[in-house]
């Protein structure tokens, strides 16, 4: 005990020396040297200016904070920051000019084997990949602006790219001009919310084999092919907006081999196809609005046990189309603006069931060039005849309780 007293007094007296240091950097200084000389927990503060840096490797807990967005210029030489550590913070920096290589996925910031790291309030411009994470967990990716200006898909990588990561928060980022805005593969137990993903060349959001994730209040707008969701289970997509994704292969969402998931309270507006589904099962679609799409829903015959309940369908060219006669899904209590039935008992439910698939949509599915006949008298005549004597549309694709008025989702 007596030996401990001097030690305690010494630690108390010299306590200031044990605190994390703040190290101020100016343009022209070697960032790698500063990182190597810093102790775990130190903060590197970047003064305003341009720093010519590439391949800076960080393997200890550090905070890297910029004042007035100092520029990290990678001089087109590969990655700018490489981070393999826990508890690293990168905030308030501007990154430009990474290398352009698919061999090593050149990125502004590349994390691997990291944990409890935060990247927030940064600007990334004209980088190949923006933020790249692999085999990492407990990441916070918040309020970053990630923008590229390539003209061809192979000239650019993904804006925010995660591979084999878990327990992450991706929040309030803006991503544009990349191949995929956000790309997730083998990512689990994560939340992506309030991101604005616009004008990317392929998908606004693209994920595969990424289970148990939630996507909340994001906007995906004018992306080359919309959003692609593949080979995944236990997904929740709620209160997102999928807008203006136009093209021959563009969708609000493409769902391929998805199961046991929820799509609730979303808006699909002005897309070529609002939702395209293939091989997907046990998904609940509730309280969604499908507005002004070419096709609100393309539901392939390989889908089963899906429920569409209490959704609004308005202003779509086609509400639903399919490629087969077998129907293993349920429509219930949806509002259809094309419904022409009546409500004699005034319970706000139509007394006559509604068949959302018309003959013309079946023909267009089989003969795409026939879309040229849209709004012609022949199409109107065909659809009227099919309503009287249905022969080619699926018998079981029917809403037995259509709503008379649209839902007010607020």
Label for each model-derived stretch:
Residues 74-81, 102-111, 126-129, 133, ...:
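Extracellular beta-strand/beta-solenoid scaffold signature
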Residues 32, 40, 51-65, 72-116, ...:
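Extracellular beta-strand-rich solenoid/capping regions of secreted or surface-exposed proteins
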Residues 4-14:
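Sec-dependent N-terminal signal peptides
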Residues 44, 56, 62, 70, ...:
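Solenoid scaffold repeats with emphasis on beta-solenoid/beta-helix
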Residues 248-252, 283-287, 291-410:
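Functionally critical loop-and-helix segments that line ligand-binding/catalytic clefts
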Residues 203-295:
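Eukaryotic tandem repeat interaction scaffolds
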Residues 21-50:
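Acidic Gly/Asp/Thr-rich repetitive segments characteristic of extracellular carbohydrate-active
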């Amino acid at each position: 005990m007596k030996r401990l007293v001097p030690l305690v007094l010494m630690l108390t007296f010299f306590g200031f020396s044990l605190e994390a240091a703040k190290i101020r950097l100016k343009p022209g200084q070697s960032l790698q040297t500063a990182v190597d000389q810093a102790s775990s927990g130190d903060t590197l503060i970047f003064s305003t200016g341009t720093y010519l840096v590439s391949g800076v490797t960080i393997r200890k807990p550090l905070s890297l904070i910029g004042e007035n967005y100092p520029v990290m210029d990678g001089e087109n030489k590969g990655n700018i920051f490489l981070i393999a550590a826990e508890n690293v913070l990168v905030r308030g920096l501007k990154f430009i000019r990474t290398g352009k290589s698919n061999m090593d996925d050149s990125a502004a910031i590349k994390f691997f084997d990291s944990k409890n790291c935060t990247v927030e309030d940064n600007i990334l411009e004209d980088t190949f990949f923006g933020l790249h994470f692999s085999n990492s967990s407990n990441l916070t990716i918040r309020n970053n602006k990630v923008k590229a200006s390539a003209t061809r898909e192979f000239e650019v990588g993904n804006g925010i790219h995660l591979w084999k990561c878990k327990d992450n928060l991706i929040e309030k980022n803006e991503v544009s001009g990349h191949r995929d805005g956000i790309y997730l593969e083998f990512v689990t137990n994560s939340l992506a919310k309030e991101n604005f993903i616009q004008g990317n060349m392929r998908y606004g959001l693209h994920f595969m084999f990424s289970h148990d994730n939630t996507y909340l209040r994001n906007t995906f707008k004018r992306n080359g092919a919309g959003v692609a969701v593949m080979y995944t289970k236990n997904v929740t997509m709620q209160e997102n907006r999928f807008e203006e994704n136009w093209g021959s292969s563009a969708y609000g969402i493409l769902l391929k081999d998805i199961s046991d998931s929820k799509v609730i309270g979303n808006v699909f507006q002005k897309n070529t196809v609002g939702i395209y589904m293939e091989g997907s099962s046990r998904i609940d679609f509730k309280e969604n609005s499908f507005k002004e799409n070419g096709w609100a829903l393309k539901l392939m015959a390989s889908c089963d046990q899906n429920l569409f309940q209490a959704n609004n369908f308005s202003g779509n060219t086609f509400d639903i189309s399919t490629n087969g006669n077998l129907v293993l899904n349920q429509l219930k209590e949806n509002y259809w603006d094309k419904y022409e039935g009546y409500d004699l008992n005034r319970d706000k439910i139509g007394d006559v069931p509604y068949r959302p698939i018309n003959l013309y949509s079946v023909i267009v599915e089989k003969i795409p060039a026939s879309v040229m006949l849209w709004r012609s008298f022949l199409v109107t005549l065909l659809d009227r005849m099919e309503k009287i004597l249905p022969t080619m549309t699926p018998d079981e694709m029917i809403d037995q309780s259509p709503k008379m008025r649209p839902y007010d989702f607020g």
